[in-house]
Every structure is written in structure tokens, then in C-alpha cells.
Amino acid sequence: MATDLSVIMILTFALWVTSPLHELQSTAAFSQTTEKINSNWEPGVNVDLAVTMQRHHLQQLFYRYGENDSLSVEGFRKLLQNIGIDKIKRVHIHHDHEHHADHEHHSDHEHHSDHEHHSDHEHHSDHEHHSDHEHHSHRSHTVAGKNNRKAFCPDLDSDNSGKNPRTSLGKGSRPAEHMNGRRNIKESASSSEVTSAVYNAVSEGTRFVETIETPKPGRRTKDVNPSTPPSITEKSRVGRLSRLARKKSNESVSEPRKSFMYSRNTNDNIQECFNTTKLLTSHGMSIQALLNATEFNYLCPAIINQIDARACLIHTASEKKAEIPPKTYSLQIAWLGGFIAISIISFLSLLGVILVPLMNRVFFKFLLSFLVALAVGTLSGDALLHLLPHSHASHQHSHSHEEPAMEMKRGPLFSHLSAQNIEESSYFDSTWKGLTALGGLYFMFLVEHVLTLIKQFKDKKKKNQKKPENDEDVESKKQLSKYDSQLSSNEEKVDPGERPESYLRADSQEPSPFDSQQPTMLEEEEVMIAHAHPQEVYNEYVPRGCKNKCHSHFHDTLGQSDDLIHHHHDYHHILHHHHHQNHHPHSHSQRYSREELKDAGIATLAWMVIMGDGLHNFSDGLAIGAAFTEGLSSGLSTSVAVFCHELPHELGDFAVLLKAGMTVKQAVLYNALSAMLAYLGMATGIFIGHYAENVSMWIFALTAGLFMYVALVDMVPEMLHNDASDHGCSRWGYFFLQNAGILLGFGIMLLISIFEHKIVFRINF
């Protein structure tokens, strides 16, 4: 209601100030309008031009809704209805590809039954279905009963130099060219019809003006100079309006009161969408000027005229199915980029050979922690900033084109620019929303991590206030000696031929290169016999036997000890050995050597790597192949995300194979076999993206879900439950290192998402 009242007050004030319109025609201000307007004038207001434009817009409004230079209550009511402030309305916009639904805010059409219809309402042969909101020519019709009224239509493109340059008219001296510019036009039924429309982009930074003049069929044009080309610059437009002011000022005050309205049959009716700068400069006002009430009153008719003419509305609902433009990629780039990306990612397994000597150093633990955080940032960033927005790209593009009739009016270039601006704004809107989601994810990570650090700090402080560490060591030694005595007595009671395989010792076996880093596999199996002892004895033994094996993901292979706080790691340890026993159902009546167990473990682990990791690589290759068919920037973004999360993953797999007893050559071979599935996935993704575009959109959505799962389920818990304090490292150092990795991953994906349309690479064969 506040908006309605403000518009009514503006309109009332404008009509009150300009009510004696016939007196304004006799003022000398109109004869002194500047012929040429300099674009860099001093800050201020050109009053003459402002008054001219004010009269121009008022004349258009009075021509549409007035009668005999006056605006009746009925006409005023129709004006309010047309600008949408007569009552509260609900607007429902339906996107119908068969026929356009009429918008409720165009309900004022039913009130124009008394208008004299011109050929503006005639449908073009190539557009059989036009919605009501496409035609606003009813606003320019003459009202029934106005047959005695004459309209003035000066020819703005012709100076009529054959006439005398000066003459005297009425009470004052006026230029003769103004008299020559004035023409009497017949009734609108026999007048010429030339539709002129000038449109420019709404953006203030980019101006695009296009003039279209289309003679209506069945009408003959008259009094229009065909040799004069349409002016498309602001300077010529302002110059024409200046000549219009001088020509209109020739009307004598002593003449009988006539209509001052302009006819629509000229090029003066400029239906242009004014932005702030355009609105001020067209009225002779500097953009640095401070507007007072009088100067603002000059702008009121233009504002109301803009609302009434709906010059700034662009209907995005398309009558026909939007044509998807050809993709800006080549099949050669897709194959080349995908092959290079998969090859680089697959060669990461060789990096593990170089890092083998560093696996037991603190530096490697810090490096791996940073890589895990970087993988979380790139995976989640690629999912929310790139994959999900691209999965909605086809839907957004299908609604980004204008209606055919609007395209015909504004031209193909304007339609292309408008569609491009709408598509870019929609895409960046999705990008900012994805960035907001990443912000929420990062905030919760910070909260949980900080709370964990605070809790660990308090626990450490309480622990230091208890018994000295020496007393604790003495007590632990007593418990271990007690357990050893119980274990030796139990071994004497068991027949050597009936001992389970869990009792196998590694004393007679040759030590492995990794025996110094962690207990042997046979020592791991001893944990499973703990059910034969009291619970307290089991609890005493677990910290020793579970050392370096209770950690999840790939850190359990890198010689890291675990903290007793994480009881779920103990449970994970039990499940791991239960799974191992199910896959090795050996008889308990036999003794197996370490080499036999190692060989069986290698075979099982090799298949796990080839099938499990190979399936993961296939999904990565599928995503990379489909992304490269979307464009080089899209493929680059997905490749970076896959690279960052495969880097720690491949290092972990390589370490698992080596610690299981494989040689370096065997580990490299099995990783290479799993990488072959990545090439197969890449080829599948390229074929799908090239021949079935709609399917590639679903691949993007599926890949986004996979990336989010890997980041949030596999890697974030690894970041939150690190064992830095067990190695004498600062937990806060790990915290800041992980934050740096996450933010770096977010930043990489954000930069690629924003500037991906500028990443262009072409190959000509």
C-alpha cells in the first residue's frame, strides 16, 4: 500500500504542476533549447531539456488516457490499473510451451474496448500465438469520441530547409522552421503507421541500442522521409528532441485550444528502458547534480511512462523449446585432456616409491595431514561449486531465452546478450549459494575441531595433576608381568598339535623390513584369543597388541599409534580380524608358516586393491570424461579435485601393499591394473557426454554425491581424530595445517568456477 500511495502522490503532483499545459506552450523556454548537448557539461540541470522531456512523457500519457487535453477520472483510473496500483493482485506466470498464459497484471486490456484499434493488434503471419503482454499498442490508441481532435506529428528527421529560417508567430517572435515542422495528421484510421522502438540493455556499463522501423501491412506511409536513416545514438536522439521542443513552441496561444498530443506514427515514440544515468542525462541533468523537488518533478512523467509502457520487462518464458547453443569444446580436446589427467593421477602410485623412506618421519605425517585437508576442500568445493551448478545448467538455459515476438522486436544481438546475462547471473547465483554451503560445512568443522582440542587440553591438564608418570610405569610393568605368567601357564595346558593358528609366534621367522615399524601379523592374531581371559586382562593387553592398527582409513598403515580415547577404533580392530578369519578358514589343527599366511594375505589384498580401488578409479574416470565434454574448464576443475583426493589415497594404498609383504614392483603393477579402469571410465564418460548430453548432467550430480561422501565420511573423521600428541606434535599445528589445506582447496575450486568461461584452449589438426 505504501508503494501505491507514493506512486499516486507522484502522479498527482506531476499533473498539478503541468496542468496549464497550453500556457507552457507559449513560453520562450522551448525556443531556446540547446541544439547540441555536450556529454561532459558541468554538474547541473538543463531546465529547457528537462521541461521538454517532461512534456514529451506527459503528452504520451495524456494521449493514451486523456481526452481534449484533459484527463478524466475514467482515464486516470485506467492509468492506475495499467501500472498496477489500482488494487492488490496476484501474479501467476505459467511457463507453457504451447500457448502463453495471460498475466493477471494485464487485466486492463478488457477496459480498452472503447479504443479504436489500429493494425498494431494485427498478428504477424510468422507468429500465430502472441500473448497479451507482448502487445502494448492499446495504450497508443485514440479514444472513441475524439474524432474532432488533431494530433501534431513533427518530422524530426527533416529540417525542411526550403522554408524561411525565421518568422513571427502570434505575440512573440518564433523561428519559422518550427511552423514548418508542425504537421496536421488525419484521423488515425487513415494515418500512416510506422512502429519505432529503441531498446538498450539495462546495464549501465554496456549500452546497446537498436532501432527497428517496421511499416504496418495494409497501411501506406506518408510524411516520413525514407532517405533518413534511423538514429541510434544518444546524441541524435537528444538533438531530435531539441528540435521537437522548438517546433512545438510555434503553436500560438491565440489559436483555439487543440490537442498537443503526439501521434504514435512517428519516430518520436521512443520506448526505451532508462537506467539511472540515462534517465538523468536525457532530461539534461548531470549525474553529479543534487535533485530538488522541482527537478524531481521533471522525472516523474518519465518514470510513470516507463512503468506504463513496461519498457524494462523481459519475458523469459519461451513459446518454443529453447535451442541449446553448440558446446564450446572439441572432441580432440576432450580425449587429450582426459588422457593426460588420468595418466597424471595414475602415476601418483609411483610417488609412493619415493616417499617410502619418509613414511616413519614426522614430516610425512604433517604432509599427509595437509593432503587430506586439501582433498576435503577440493572434493566438497568441486561438488558444490561446479558439479551441482552444471547439473542444473540445461534447465536454467531452457528458460533463458525471450519470447519470439520479443526477439523480433529487439533483434538477435540484443536477445543473445540478454540470454547470456541471464544465464551468467543464474550460474553465479548457484556458485554463491554453493559457497554458502561450503561456509556452513567449514563452520561446523571449526566448531567440532575446536571443541575437541579444548576437551583434550582439559584432559591432559587433569592427567598431569594425578600420579607421576613413574608410578604409572611401575604399575603397568606389574600388570604386564602378571599377564605373561598367566599366558605361559595357559600355553603349557594346551597340546602343541591342537594350538590354534592364533598362537603362532614369529620368533622363528626372518624379520620383515617393516617388523621394526609395527608388530607382526601373528601378533595381531593373538588379540582374537583375548576372550579366554578375564576382561580386565584383555583390557590390559589391547593397548599393546592394538598398537599402530586401530586407526581407520590409510593411517593404520603408516606406523602411527592410536589414542585410548577412541574406543570405536578398538571395535574396528576386532571387526578387521573377524573379516580376516572369515576369508582364511584354516584348520586350527595345523601350523602355518609366516610365508604361507603372507602369501594368502597378498592374494586377497591384491584383489581388494584391484576391485575396490579399481571401481573407485572407474567412477573418477567417468566424471573426468563427462566433464571434459562439457568444456576444458569443467574438465580441469574435476581433474584437480580427483587429483587432490587421489594423492593421499594412492599413497595409502601403496603403503598397504608394501606392509602386506609385496615388493615395490608388485605394488606398482597392481596399482597400474586398477588405473586401467580409470581409462575405461574416461572413455565411457566422453562417449556419454558427446552423444547423450542429458545423461552427462546426471553423471555430474552422481559424481557430486560421491565426492561429498568421500570428503565427509572418509576424510573429515581422519582430520578430526588425529594422533598428533602421541608423537610429540602440537595438535594446534595440525589444526592450522588442516585449515590451510581446506581453505586452499576451496579457493582453487572457487577460482575455477568463477573464471571457467575464460579458460579457452583450442587445438587445430
Swiss-Prot record:
Modified residues (Phosphoserine): 481, 488
Upregulating conditions: Induced during neuronal differentiation neuroblastoma cells line but down-regulated during myogenic differentiation of skeletal muscle cells line. Induced during epithelialto-mesenchymal transition (EMT).
Processing and modification events after translation: Cleaved on the N-terminus before locating to the plasma membrane.
Localization of this protein: Cell membrane; Cell projection, Lamellipodium membrane; Membrane raft; Apical cell membrane
Predominant localisation class: membrane
Topology in the lipid bilayer: Multi-pass membrane protein
Leader sequence segment: 1-20
InterPro entries according to UniProt: ZIP (IPR003689), ZIP_Transporter (IPR050799)
Keyword vocabulary terms for this entry: Cell membrane, Cell projection, Coiled coil, Glycoprotein, Ion transport, Membrane, Phosphoprotein, Signal, Transmembrane, Transmembrane helix, Transport, Zinc, Zinc transport
Glycoprotein among keywords: yes
Composition bias type Basic and acidic residues, residue spans: 96-135, 174-186, 248-257, 490-508
GO CC annotations, alphabetized: apical plasma membrane; endoplasmic reticulum; lamellipodium membrane; membrane raft; plasma membrane
Transmembrane portions of the chain: 336-356, 366-386, 434-454, 668-688, 697-717, 735-755
Biased composition (Low complexity): 187-196
Keyword Membrane recorded: yes
GO biological process, one term: intracellular zinc ion homeostasis
Residues carrying covalently attached carbohydrate according to the record: 68, 250, 275, 292, 694
Membrane side Cytoplasmic: residue ranges: 357-365, 455-667, 718-734
Protein name listed in UniProt: Zinc transporter ZIP6
Taxonomic source organism: Mus musculus (Mouse)
